[in-house]
Amino acid sequence: MMIALVAAAALTVEARVSFNDIAPIVWRRCTTCHRPGAIGPFSLATYEDVKRRATQIKIVTARRIMPPWKPEPGKGDFESERRLTDSELEQIQRWIADGAIEGDSKDLPPMPAQPAAEAWQLGTPDLVVRMPEAYTVAAGGTDVFRTFVLPIALPRARFVRALEFRPGTARVVHHANIGVDRTRSSRQLDLKDPEPGYVGGMVPDARYPEGQLLGWTPGQAAHPVPPGTAWRLEPGSDLVVQLHMQPTGKPETLQVSVGFYFTDEAPSRTPLGLRLGSETIDIPPGARDYVVADRYVLPVDADVLAVQPHAHNLARRMEAGATLPDGTTRWLIAIDDWDFRWQDVYRYKSPVALPKGTAIAMRYTYDNSDGNARNPHHPPARVVWGQNTSDEMGDLWIQIVARSAGDAAVLADDIRRKSHADDLAAYVKLLREDPGNPLRHDAVGNLYLEDARYDDAIAEYRASLSLNADSAPTHYNLGFALSMRGRRDEARGAFEQALRLDPEYAQAHNNLGAMLQLAGRAGEALDHFRRAVALRPDNVDAQINLAQLLSAQGRAREALDHFEAALTLRGDSAQALAGIAWIRATVADPSLRNSEQAAELRQRLILYQRRQPYRQSNFL
């Protein structure tokens, strides 16, 4: 009887966990970052690597600091989740408790093949853009936040199906935010800074393209956009990359590169970027439970594809969810311990379907007390909304798409109204607090211009120029607002002043040409249109204005060249289609006349159903 009992007890003894058991977990969850050449400060690719760090691994996995994954389980079903499962965590803890034994190396499963740290995950890109100059991060000091402008050499508009970010020196880059600037205002800031890039965040003109949430964090895999949602990249655009960089103890040089993957398939649906949050944050010193909350009611049925929370150092808890018309609720995301150092775009495994009338809400809680170890201010100080790390933000970006193509315009217009109202309230508040800052007047003026509040915009631009008369963009924007009020002589003077300050301001040449043509000074107008095109061959408006004036002067062959250049840049340009069709149908020169092409272009015009007026460039 005793022998039987002993035997039975022996059968219940669990085998010791060896590295053979946990290696697949480490390779799946950790070596994306922790391998030679990758961003992790040390490698975990071998048994020796992992055993050397066993005590540290025990602590950071038990506290769920590593692998970094902030969303709470059960409150959003996301792709590429890095969180350890409970069973994986238990196995790692047992292995370390058992002495971190290796086991029989011949039983070790093979490590999955991984691309080189700097290899393209999606294959060879169609286009690669790079920082024009490398940037060196000092050996020591605090974290560095800097924005870089990467010019995009693109002869015509293309649809982007994927974008892949390569940090260069991966161990230095903590995360990146990426936008597209069609105005070149980011480039102007870059030119004014003697070092590569510039200090500060992305300007408002550097935007996510057409509802895409672009960014990079360590371990983040590159993914193509969802089917049918490719986005349009216009020629003349700049890629703007805001980097959070960390000193490593020695000087590190980096040069970011970004790969673009194109498709000829036009999007069948266009996602939108819905931003919930506040730009009027004002947190008193010592406040422990300052709340930012916002909500938005869907005007149509829609699908949520991804979310991206953003705040700085004082945020502690984040919650976002949806209340459906029948009263049921759904979590979108929850983060109990926000950490500014670990940001990400969280993409749902399946779109979150929300019916019309659903209220989407967010609530962030901030702690501006000494009890917050991440508070950058000691003693605590008043913290307001702003782009600097010592300021605070509170945004929830939501990538959303209308369920029906017919509802897309309704959703886009409704989101635009909300965003514009939020922006205007924020920048008016900033202006009141800092009326001597010309940039504040410019920002409010630009928002008034978008609202067609031209007199208000004119007043803000004049106030800005009273503080800084040497700003060519402000003179240009003033000229645009004056032209929209029909004050052409004053507008012409503003454009001329912009060109005195910046003779290579292509948009000012274009719009001055427009004013001169309307004044009957066609010869001078032609000179400015030619100069605008020479400076910016990718400026569709200037190409069209030049072509139209040449056509009116009977210079059909040259006009055709510029109409066709415009059509190459913007394939749905009604002016270019109409201009080419008119010349092909009416020109006397038999070598240029082409009735068949004229008829085809007229049909394209009918299909587009667009009748665009004579265009000037937009502001900035």
Each PLM stretch: what is its role?
Residues 7-155, 236-242, 247-249:
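Aromatic- and Gly/Pro-enriched helix-to-coil junctions and flexible linker segments
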Residues 117-403:
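His-enriched metal-coordination microenvironments in redox/metal-binding proteins
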Residues 439-450, 473-484, 507-518, 541-551, ...:
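Conserved alpha-helical positions within TPR/SEL1-like repeat arrays
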Residues 586-595, 600-620:
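Terminal, low-structured helical/coil segments at or just beyond the last alpha-helical repeat
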